[in-house]
Structure formats: structure tokens, C-alpha cells
Amino acid sequence: MAPKKDKAPPPSSKPAKSGGKQKKKKWSKGKQKEKVNNLVLFDNATFDKLLSEAGKQKVVTAATLSERFRINGSLARRAIRELVSRGAIKMVCHHSSLQIYTRSTNEKVNPTAA
């Protein structure tokens, strides 16, 4: 009697697995930033609020005004120009992309006390 041939598994196109069986990794859903709905034009209430409160802030930048008053970035830059012209804030440091301002104090500079 001829010896029985063991059935060999049919050849597959997949390479042989090594190691234990692992779950397939799932893609995580990317986090999406919430869209902000900022004002593009000033209304009277927002402009009056800006004039009264922005001069009291320690640090004034376009980003802080945009976040606090919910206004557009370009509108915040125009508001800063208006506040500087009124003397409510003064420039501390400027860079090509960021200008930093602070509240104006009504101190008189003594030229002889240097």
C-alpha cells in the first residue's frame, strides 16, 4: 500500500504571517477645529466696548482683540491703529508679523531724571 500524501495548503499570494494574530489598526478621526464666526464690520456696541475696554488690557495684539471681541483679524488691526491714534495704547515691540501694544499711562517723562 502506498503511503498517503498529506494535503498541502493551496499556495496563496499572501506572505506567511509571523507572530501572533493582531487586530488591524484603525485610523483615528482627525480633530477638526471649530469654525469661529467673527464680525467683519464693527457695530456701534462692539466699537464702544472696544474703545472702553481695550485701553485697560495689559497686552494688546490683533489676536487678543480678535478673540476677546469676536472680530476679524484685519478689523482688529484697524482697531489697533485707531486706538494708537487716540492715545489709548502705545507700542511696546514690533516685528514684521506681530505688533505688541500696552495701555498708555499718563505719566509725564522727566528728562533730567535719567
From Swiss-Prot:
Keyword vocabulary terms for this entry: Ribonucleoprotein, Ribosomal protein
Region (Disordered): 1-33
Feature: compositional bias, Basic residues: 20-30
Superkingdom classification of source: Eukaryota
A GO CC term assigned to this protein in UniProt: ribosome
InterPro entries: Ribosomal_eS25
Pfam families reported in the protein's UniProt record: Ribosomal_S25
Family: Belongs to the eukaryotic ribosomal protein eS25 family.
Name under which the protein is recorded: Small ribosomal subunit protein eS25
Organism field: Amaranthus cruentus (Purple amaranth)
